[in-house]
Structures are given as structure tokens and as C-alpha cells.
UniProtKB/Swiss-Prot annotation:
UniProt KW Lyase keyword: no
Keywords carried by this UniProt record: Methyltransferase, S-adenosyl-L-methionine, Transferase
Binding site for substrate: 182-185
Family note: Belongs to the protein N5-glutamine methyltransferase family. PrmC subfamily.
This protein's record includes keyword Nucleotide-binding: no
Recorded GO MF terms: nucleic acid binding; protein-(glutamine-N5) methyltransferase activity; protein-glutamine N-methyltransferase activity
Class in the EC hierarchy, top level: transferase
GO BP: methylation; translational termination
Disulfide bond residue pairs: none
Protein name as it appears in the record: Release factor glutamine methyltransferase
EC number(s) reported in the record: 2.1.1.297
Function: Methylates the class 1 translation termination release factors RF1/PrfA and RF2/PrfB on the glutamine residue of the universally conserved GGQ motif.
Residues bound to S-adenosyl-L-methionine: 116-120, 139, 167, 182
Length: 276
């Protein structure tokens, strides 16, 4: 029989920068308890079934599999989302895109499009904050569409429509007050693709050509046909792509183009306004 304290001590993940947190999350979930339980009752015996479940999960984590995929869920904004290996894991940096969208569009009612929705994180976060907005969330991957719809239903967000579309392909000329997106933006040759958690994430949601801008170019080129007059386009991109994305938006005719930095000081979100 093993106590919580002993199991945490003996099951560290030396190769993970968040080793203690990862271990606690896995053990708490294996026991069906909140993390606070582990610290409140460190001498409690871990039940055999929970111990076996934890041993399996910790082995998967040592192999590099992300905690979110092991547990099947991830927190984003104020939401708890189901995740799966055919979608990206929502990241804290992307919350800046949600913050920017909410700050940019002050209207109580609006139509918003989320491109490449994945788990539905961005669309569902916006819809939860603005219940009178009508949000359309699209993804080209059928499994991602099904996952986003499950998250929508579980969160009871009736102001979101989830549908399958490769960017704008299935939108039939519909126009929106705002378009947001976190498209693939990693260059195909980036060595980080073979390192850490990202090894387990779908490359189709990460890689966009030799310079990482192929999908952003396509979105910028097509977005004006789907924006209302004075509508906004907001895009997340790589830390070193701000200047390139600003140039693309400016060349396409967007006004007020500017870039916001994330908490790490990196250029992360670029936006511009369309005027017919």
C-alpha cells in the first residue's frame, strides 16, 4: 500500500518542465479527487485501482504524451473542454485572441466566424461571454467538428453553430462582423515539431508550408468576401511572424492593422479592419 506523498515523490517526471503539476493532475484524476485533496491528505493510502491507473498514465506521460490527451480534457478561458489527438490542445496564449475579440467588438449582437475551431475553444469562449453573439465555428476535420459539437452541447451554448468547412469553402457567401482564427503557422522544417508535447499533436493543425504562412495567406486573401463593411479579421500567428502578417493584411487593403503581444512579450495576434 502506497500513500499519496510517497507516490508523488517516487513518480517525478524529470524531463518535464511542469513535472510536479503533471504528476499531481494525473494522480488526482486517477483518484477522482481535486488536487487540493492530495495536499490536504498526503498520508492517505491510494486505492489499488487508482494506483494502477496512475502508473499507466505516468508511463504515458514519461513517453511524452500530453497530460490533456491522457485525461481527455483541458481548461481554456473559464471552460473545461474535451480534447482528443485529432485536435490541438488549447493553449493559454490563445486566450489573448479571445480577449482581443471581446475588446475589439463592443456590440451586444454580432455575427462571428471562428476558422479552424478544433475543440471549439475560441468560439465557445466568445459565445459564453457574449450570449447574444451568433458564432459559427468551422473545421475541415470531421472528428474535430464532432468534438467541438460535443463541447458545445455539454456547455449548453445555443448561440454557436458548428459545421464542417475548409476555411470558407462551405459558407456560401455568408458575411460576418468578425472573423477570428488560430490557423497552422509553423514552418515544415521547424525542429520543434519533433520535440515535447507537440510530437503528439496533428501536424495538419500545426504546419503551413515552408514559411508557416500558407494558410494565413489564404485566409487573408479570402476573408474580405466574408466580412461585413468595417468588419474585423483577427489572427494568431508565430512569435516571429508579426511583420509578415501585418504586410499581408495591409497589402490586401485592411486598415488599422496592428499586432498585440502575449504575456511572454512575443508578437502573437494581428488584426485589421475591412472597409469596402
Amino acid at each position: 500500500m502506497t500513500t499519496i506523498c510517497t507516490l508523488l515523490k517516487d513518480s517525478q517526471l524529470p524531463d518535464s518542465p511542469s513535472a510536479r503539476l503533471d504528476t499531481e493532475l494525473l494522480l488526482a484524476a486517477a483518484m477522482g479527487k481535486p488536487r487540493s485533496f492530495l495536499r490536504t491528505w498526503p498520508e492517505r493510502i491510494v486505492p489499488r485501482e487508482a494506483n494502477e491507473r496512475f502508473d499507466d498514465w505516468i508511463a504515458r506521460r514519461r513517453n511524452g504524451e500530453p497530460v490533456a490527451y491522457i485525461l481527455g480534457h483541458q481548461g481554456f478561458w473559464s471552460l473545461d473542454l474535451e480534447v482528443a489527438p485529432h485536435t490541438l490542445i488549447p493553449r493559454p496564449d490563445t486566450e489573448l485572441l479571445v480577449e482581443t475579440a471581446l475588446a475589439t467588438l463592443a456590440a451586444d449582437t454580432a455575427t462571428v466566424l471562428d476558422l479552424g475551431t478544433g475543440t471549439g475553444a475560441i468560439a465557445l469562449a466568445l459565445a459564453s461571454e457574449r450570449p447574444l453573439w451568433t458564432v459559427t465555428a468551422v473545421d475541415r476535420v470531421e472528428e474535430a467538428v464532432a468534438l467541438a459539437e460535443r463541447n458545445r452541447q455539454r456547455l449548453l451554448l445555443e448561440n454557436v453553430e458548428v459545421r464542417r468547412s475548409h476555411w470558407f469553402s462551405a459558407l456560401d457567401g455568408r458575411r460576418f462582423r468578425m472573423i477570428v482564427g488560430n490557423p497552422p503557422y509553423i514552418p515544415a522544417s521547424d525542429p520543434h515539431l519533433s520535440e515535447g508535447d507537440v510530437r503528439f499533436e496533428p501536424k495538419s493543425a500545426l504546419v503551413a508550408g515552408s514559411d508557416g504562412l500558407d494558410d494565413i495567406r489564404q485566409i487573408v486573401a479570402q476573408a474580405p468576401r466574408h466580412l461585413l463593411d468595417e468588419g474585423w479579421l483577427l489572427l494568431e500567428h508565430g512569435y516571429d511572424q508579426g511583420a509578415a502578417v501585418r504586410e499581408l493584411l495591409g497589402a490586401r487593403g485592411f486598415a488599422g492593422v496592428h499586432t498585440l503581444r502575449d504575456l511572454g512579450g512575443n508578437e502573437r495576434i494581428t488584426l485589421g479592419q475591412w472597409a469596402c
